[in-house]
């Protein structure tokens, strides 16, 4: 899990219970990756899975496309920032010249927030913007730390990744959301396939960044596991909707060799999820989840809120440009403890979450 939910303390608490802890390094800089992997080792022993995105080339949007996407966020910006607040820059804009940040008009209407000005600069004026990290540079920080597992989301990494990982005897896992992707993974040199069903929270691991909402081969994680176990030789790891011991047993019965759990741990005391995120996970079972591109430009499942509803028919940039475009908005929403404009990633079975320690959750899983 990435996005601030995953912390050193969170992963270490999982390791202490005898489980493999996964740390999402999606957008992390190399120095942060080294620091966090070393910090985990200092706090606990056990297997660590370092997880990365496989980014695909993306073209900078036209000025018109950027303006449309920025304008689509205006209602959310206005809901979060009062006219008095609008003269104070949001995160990321402190280094911009004053003339690049729009101010409220004389009529009191809000101009573009500072994070939008920041995106105009970075998206249109940089060939290698910071929101598109180099996988090579990220992994250069990983190899010396020797995590027990490397895993990848959004596709098969370059061949050199497998060469180095195999040389260092580090297994490589890759997410698949349908059989076609799983067969590509099997031919790549990976050691196992993570079968990510449609119930899973967070980003869908689809290889195609513009995959439609209804393109899944399977209607559930269990069905996907069954299909992949029948057609693939590699071990299959079930992910998505695995919340309790019964879910684990159901996945294993269909051919999974292991399971990967995310949402079940989100409401744990040690989780880095925001207080309002945890509150909604355990206190609003009827809120429901939705697959949306609104926050990042790629399909991701999270709790429904005002932002996901507002953005259903509005302009969205390609991934990961939209992620950068909404960064300031999400940060401002978190500072205001307002869950309606945060990316509250969660699987469709989130109502089974409990407010408890990681230790208590693992005990429940073992005793059932």
Residue ranges of model-derived segments:
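Conserved active-site-proximal phosphate/metal-binding subdomains
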Residues: 74, 78, 200-237, 242-368
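Active-site entrance/lid segments in N-terminal catalytic domains of soluble metabolic enzymes
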Residues: 1-231
């Amino acid at each position: 899990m990435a996005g601030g939910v995953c912390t050193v303390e969170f992963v270490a608490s999982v390791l202490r219970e005898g489980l493999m802890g996964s740390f999402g390094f999606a957008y992390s800089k190399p120095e942060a990756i080294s620091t966090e992997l070393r910090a985990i080792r200092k706090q606990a022993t056990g297997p660590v899975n370092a997880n990365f995105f496989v980014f695909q080339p993306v073209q900078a949007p036209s000025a018109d496309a950027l303006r449309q996407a920025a304008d689509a966020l205006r209602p959310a910006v206005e809901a979060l920032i009062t006219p008095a607040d609008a003269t104070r820059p949001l995160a990321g804009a402190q280094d911009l010249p004053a003339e690049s940040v729009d101010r409220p008009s004389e009529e009191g209407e809000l101009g573009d927030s500072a994070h939008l000005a920041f995106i105009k600069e970075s998206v249109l004026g940089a060939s290698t913007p910071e929101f598109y990290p180099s996988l090579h540079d990220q992994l250069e920080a990983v190899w010396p730390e020797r995590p027990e597992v490397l895993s990848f989301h959004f596709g098969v990494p370059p061949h050199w990744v497998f060469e180095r990982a195999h040389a260092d005897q580090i297994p490589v896992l890759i997410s698949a959301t349908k059989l076609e992707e799983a067969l590509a993974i099997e031919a790549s040199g990976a050691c196992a396939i993570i079968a990510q069903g449609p119930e899973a929270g967070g980003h869908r691991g689809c290889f195609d960044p513009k995959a439609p909402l209804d393109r899944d081969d399977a209607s559930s994680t269990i069905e996907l596991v069954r299909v992949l176990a029948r057609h693939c030789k590699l071990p299959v790891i079930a992910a998505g909707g695995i919340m309790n011991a019964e879910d684990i047993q159901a996945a294993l019965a269909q051919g999974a060799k292991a399971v990967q759990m995310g949402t079940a741990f989100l409401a744990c005391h040690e989780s880095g999820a925001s207080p309002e995120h945890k509150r909604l996970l355990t206190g609003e079972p009827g809120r429901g989840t939705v697959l949306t591109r609104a926050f990042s430009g790629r399909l991701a499942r999270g709790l429904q809120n005002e932002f996901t509803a507002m953005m259903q028919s509005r302009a969205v940039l390609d991934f990961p440009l939209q992620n950068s475009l909404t960064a300031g908005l999400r940060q401002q929403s978190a500072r205001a403890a307002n869950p309606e404009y945060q990316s509250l990633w969660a699987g469709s079975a989130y109502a089974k979450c409990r407010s408890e320690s990681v230790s208590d959750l693992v005990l429940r899983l073992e005793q059932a």
